[in-house]
Amino acid sequence: MDSKKRSHSTGGEAENMESQESKAKRKPLQKHQFSKSNVVQKEEKDKTEGEEKGAEGLQEVVRQSRLRTAPSVLEFRFNKQRVRLISQDCHLQDQSQAFVYWMSRDQRVQDNWAFLYAQRLALKQKLPLHVCFCLAPCFLGATIRHYDFMLRGLEEVAEECEKLCIPFHLLLGLPKDVLPAFVQTHGIGGIVTDFSPLLHHTQWVKDVQDALPRQVPFVQVDAHNIVPCWVASDKQEYGARTIRHKIHDRLPHFLTEFPPVICHPYTSNVQAEPVDWNGCRAGLQVDRSVKEVSWAKPGTASGLTMLQSFIAERLPYFGSDRNNPNKDALSNLSPWFHFGQVSVQRAILEVQKHRSRYPDSVTNFVEEAVVRRELADNFCFYNKNYDKLEGAYDWAQTTLRLHAKDKRPHLYSLEQLESGKTHDPLWNAAQMQTVKEGKMHGFLRMYWAKKILEWTRSPEEALEFAIYLNDRFQLDGWDPNGYVGCMWSICGIHDQGWAEREIFGKIRYMNYAGCKRKFDVAEFERKISPAD
C-alpha cells in the first residue's frame, strides 16, 4: 500500500526500511535513561515558554515541534516496524478511489502513527483519505460514563478532521456490519487500523478482514505503544525485569518526534454526513446510572492540559509521593491514554525534558507509563486467558486451588462490594472513590483487588468480581492495564511466590496494618465517605 506505483507490492518499502535499520548501529542506552539522540531535542526557550503559558503554551510548543520534524509524513522516515499486514493481498488496485483509516483504540488526530501512516499512503498515491469510527450502541458492560467520555473526544476529532479536509464518518454498528460496506460502496483501495491486544478488538479485525474484498490491502499500526507490541517481544514476558531491557534497547529507534497530520490536498467526492452527537448519546443502549465525572474533561486538548498540569505541579513529587493516596502526585492521564486521546509517546517526550531537574520522578514515570504499560499489552497479546485464572502461571493456579476451600473471614456479595458495604473502611473508601470519580489511586488498586480475593468464595469469583467492578466504574476500564492489575493482585501475574498463608497461598499478601504503615489511612477514609 506504500508503493511508488499502484501495481507494486505494498510491502516493498517496509522491507527496505527494516533492512536499513538492521544495519544501523545502536547506541547504548543506560538503564532507565534515554540517550540524547533518541528524540528531537527541544530548545530550552520552548520549554520555558510552554511552562509560562500553561496548557496553551504546551500545545503550541508541541505543534512547532511537529513542524520542525517534517513538513508532512511524506518527508518523514516512517519506521515500518510499526506496521503489520493483516490481509493476504498487499497490492493496491488501479481503480482505488481513496484510503480509510479505521480509528478504534487511538482516538486522536495528531501524534497518531496509524493516522500518519494512512495519510502517508494517501499522499503517495494522490488519493483522498477518510476516517471511519464504528460506534456500537452497546459494548460489553460500558456505561454512559465511558461512552460520554469517548463521544466527546470523538467530537473533537471530527472537528479537527474537518479543518484538515479529511472526512470523518461515524458508522453506527459493529465494524463487520458497516465498514466493509463503506469500503465497497466508495471504492476504498486500502485500510489502515490501529492496534489493541484485547480479544474483542482482535475479533473485530478478523471479522472485517473476512468480510473485505480479497483485493483490498489491510494493515495494522501500533499507535498505542512506543515500541510496537510485536517488536518489543515475540512471546509472553515473565515480568517487568524480562521486558525492560528489550524496550529500553529499542527506544532510540521508536521514541521520536511526530510529523504533523496536514491538511489533505486530495479531496473526495464522498462527503461526511454531519453527526448528530446528541442523537448518538440518546440512542445508546447503555446503563445510565453510572454518571459522567467532572474532574476529567474529554478530548486531546483537555488531555494535554492535564499533561501540562502534571509537569508543572505534580511531576516534582511523583518520585517520592506516587504511592501515597493522600498526596496529589499522579499524572491522572490514564483516561486519556486509555481512549487514545493523548499519546503516551507525546507524554514521555514532554516529561523527559525535565529529567535533569527531577531524575527520580522522570525515571519512575517512564517505568510506569512505558515499561509497565507495554508489559500489560504484551500479556494480553500473547495470553488469550488474560482475564481468567487459566491465564496465571502454573504455580499460582496450583496454590490458589489448594487454598480455594480455606475459610474466609468475611464473605460479601457483588452488590455489597459494589456499594462499599464491607467491614473495612479503607476498602469502602477506595470503592466509593471509584464509584464517584471513575478512578482509584494505583496503590489502593492493589489492596482493593487482594481483599476481594480474601472476601469471596473462590479465586475465580474474586477475579470475576474485581474485573466487573473495575470495568464498570473506572474511566479506564476494559484496558490491558486493568486486566493485568487484577491478575497481578489475585493471580500473581508478573510477580513471584511468597510465604504461604491461608486463602492467598503463595500470592503476595496485603493488609490494613500494612497500609497504615505506608500512609495516613484515616485521612483518606475521611476524604472519601461511603455512599448513603
Curated annotation (Swiss-Prot):
DNA binds at R322. This is Deoxyribodipyrimidine photo-lyase. It is an enzyme of class 4 (lyase). Keywords: Chromophore, DNA damage, DNA repair, DNA-binding, FAD, Flavoprotein, Lyase. It catalyses: cyclobutadipyrimidine (in DNA) = 2 pyrimidine residues (in DNA). The lineage of its organism: Eukaryota, Metazoa, Chordata, Craniata, Vertebrata. InterPro entries: Crypto/Photolyase_FAD-like_sf, Crypto/Photolyase_N_sf, DNA_photolyase_2, DNA_photolyase_2_CS, DNA_photolyase_N, Photolyase_Class-2, Rossmann-like_a/b/a_fold. Residues 368-376, 442-443 are annotated as: Interaction with DNA. The keyword DNA repair applies. The gene is PHR. Residues 1-57 are annotated as: Disordered. It holds the Pfam family DNA_photolyase. Its cofactor is FAD. Its EC number is 4.1.99.3. Residues 24-34 have a biased composition (Basic residues). Residues 97-229 form the Photolyase/cryptochrome alpha/beta domain. Involved in repair of UV radiation-induced DNA damage. Catalyzes the light-dependent monomerization (300-600 nm) of cyclobutyl pyrimidine dimers (in cis-syn configuration), which are formed between adjacent bases on the same DNA strand upon exposure to ultraviolet radiation. Belongs to the DNA photolyase class-2 family. Residues 41-55 have a biased composition (Basic and acidic residues). One of its GO terms (biological process) is photoreactive repair. GO terms for molecular function: deoxyribodipyrimidine photo-lyase activity; DNA binding. FAD binds at Y468, L469, N470.
